[in-house]
Amino acid sequence: MRLCDKDIEQYLDDEKIIIEPKPDSSMISGVSVDIRLGNEFRVFQDHTAPYIDLSAPKGEVQEAMNSIMSDEIFIADGDAFFLHPGELALAVTYESVTLPDNIVGWLDGRSSLARLGLMVHVTAHRIDPGWSGQIVLEFYNSGKLPLALRPKMKIAALNFETMSSSAARPYNKREDAKYRDQKGAVASRISQDEKVNK
């Protein structure tokens, strides 16, 4: 069951859901909380790699990732990050979110931004029960013009769904949780995935 605005406010007041800094009531709508853009970004650099073999040995995957991903880029408040048409970039939410073991979060883009071609997540919009940290955004500009994105602008909406019971394996207790307590525009850690050989 999705939480309505009254429930979201109560869960925030009771600290069952923690969003830092805590949103004021103007950021809470009927079923969601507005989330703002943070200051950290990463882009894919010019490179000569013909491809990344995602099933290669971990070291090779990490080496390929290091060759294409930029260091973290900090954009000061008031300045803009420009996302060009056809470009993929990573960013991070201004807010940090902590969920209990019995709530899953869903991050959705804003319709007004989507109508300009901005996707705020490529496929990863689920926030697992037990999550704690900032949320990395996978930006893609499918429009025709560059988009100027500024820290602290409203960038997405987060809504919450109660589960039938608490998760037996919440994110914060999993040994394979690669993004636990995430801060900043963390690049893919796919090289840490366990290889499954069948």
Curated annotation (Swiss-Prot):
Recorded coiled-coil stretches: none
Basic and acidic residues bias locations: 172-183
GO biological process: dUMP biosynthetic process; dUTP biosynthetic process; nucleobase-containing small molecule interconversion
InterPro entries linked to this entry: dCTP_deaminase, dUTPase-like_sf, dUTPase_trimeric
GO molecular function, one term: dCTP deaminase activity
Region (Disordered): 168-198
UniProt EC number: 3.5.4.13
One Pfam family in the UniProt entry: DCD
Pathway(s) annotated for this protein in UniProt: Pyrimidine metabolism; dUMP biosynthesis; dUMP from dCTP (dUTP route): step 1/2
Gene3D superfamilies registered for this protein in UniProt: 2.70.40.10
SUPFAM superfamilies from the UniProt entry: dUTPase-like
Function comment: Catalyzes the deamination of dCTP to dUTP.
Similarity section: Belongs to the dCTP deaminase family.
HAMAP family: dCTP_deaminase
Name recorded for this polypeptide: dCTP deaminase
